[in-house]
């Protein structure tokens, strides 16, 4: 179990990343504390955010600096990979828009753009709802963007995952916003029937999300 003081430090560092202008007293971080922070960051998938805050507002113990340097390189690599996936997803959304496919983006990037440094909040995939009538046209757009159906997935499944072997982008294409097999899924989906005609476009990086 991670000690309470390290858990509190973890939360303080997240606050510092989210609000860089907030004043915070310098914190001394030992190798043991750094190990605890690494574990929590990996568990909650916020490693780049914590590393960013550590670099801005922490005083590392001399014997923790080497470990932090390795951790920082890993975090910056994750940010670079996420930035590449984000750009690929923006290009995909623009291509879907150009093909007049009414895709509805939800979760994923729409939440990450709320962060001050969105690509520091890494995401394993993105989610899109595309009406079944546009399956064939959408598949052509995905393929033109270098994406292919993930191994084991069926193009006609309720959720189909497309992957790009070059950028690492993974996109889950949903045929409904809520799983039909779930108890309340059908009822919830009825509330959002025709949502592709009522979607609100969020302009980001030249693409409509």
Provide a role label for each language-model segment.
Residues 1-124, 130-209:
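Conserved NTP-donor binding/palm subdomain of two-metal-ion nucleotidyltransferases/polymerases, i.e.
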């Amino acid at each position: 179990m991670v000690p309470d003081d390290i858990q509190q430090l973890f939360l303080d560092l997240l606050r510092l990343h989210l609000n860089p202008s907030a004043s915070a007293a310098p914190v001394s971080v030992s190798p043991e504390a750094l190990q605890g922070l690494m574990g929590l960051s990996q568990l909650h998938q916020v490693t780049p955010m914590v590393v960013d805050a550590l670099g801005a507002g922490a005083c590392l113990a001399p014997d923790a600096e080497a470990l932090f340097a390795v951790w920082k390189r890993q975090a910056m690599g994750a940010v670079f990979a996420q930035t590449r996936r984000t750009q690929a997803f923006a290009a995909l959304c623009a291509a879907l828009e150009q093909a007049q496919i009414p895709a509805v983006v939800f979760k994923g990037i729409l939440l990450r753009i709320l962060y001050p440094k969105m690509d520091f909040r890494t995401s394993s995939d993105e989610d899109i709802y595309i009406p079944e009538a546009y399956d064939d046209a959408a598949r052509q757009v995905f393929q033109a963007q270098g994406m292919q159906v993930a191994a084991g997935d069926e193009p006609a499944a309720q959720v189909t995952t497309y992957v790009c072997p070059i950028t690492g982008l993974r996109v889950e294409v949903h045929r409904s916003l809520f799983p039909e097999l779930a108890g309340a899924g059908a009822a919830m989906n009825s509330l959002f029937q025709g949502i592709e005609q009522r979607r609100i476009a969020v302009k980001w990086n030249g693409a409509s999300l």
